């Protein structure tokens, strides 16, 4: 639990991922540079995600200190492995992509153009970790 004394960024908490989780995180979740080199570790990823999620609070009039407290609380529960968000959130929060949803229902029009648009949209959603379904009604 975050106390009112925790107004600054929490120091990096020790995070122990299983060997399997470390492999998956390196392959799918950690940010990479233009040379495809990993540029963050688990604490960095959790901070990136926590800061991005908490930043939304500013849109609803929250003070900077409240945003920081929310970020720290979210960072703590992730670091303790009490809660881990879905894959698109881990991959995209705090990046230009920003898609956090995991599931999308796409329209499918009964024409060649509509089918090809659905195929394109499906590929783009899946590129960023989302799953797709189609509205056939």
Predicted segments, located by residue:
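Extended catalytic cores of very large enzyme megasubunits
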Residues: 1-137
């Amino acid at each position: 639990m975050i106390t009112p004394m925790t107004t600054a960024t929490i120091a990096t908490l020790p995070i122990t991922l299983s060997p399997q989780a470390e492999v998956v995180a390196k392959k799918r979740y950690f940010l990479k540079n233009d040379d495809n080199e990993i540029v963050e570790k688990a604490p960095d990823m959790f901070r990136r995600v926590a800061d991005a999620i908490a930043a939304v609070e500013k849109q609803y009039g929250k003070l900077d200190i409240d945003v920081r407290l929310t970020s720290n609380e979210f960072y703590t529960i992730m670091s303790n492995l009490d809660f881990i968000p879905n894959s698109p959130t881990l991959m995209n929060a705090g990046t230009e992509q920003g898609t956090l949803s995991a599931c999308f229902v796409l329209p499918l029009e009964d024409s060649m153009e509509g089918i090809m648009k659905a195929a394109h949209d499906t590929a783009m959603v899946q590129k960023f970790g989302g799953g797709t379904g189609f509205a056939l009604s």
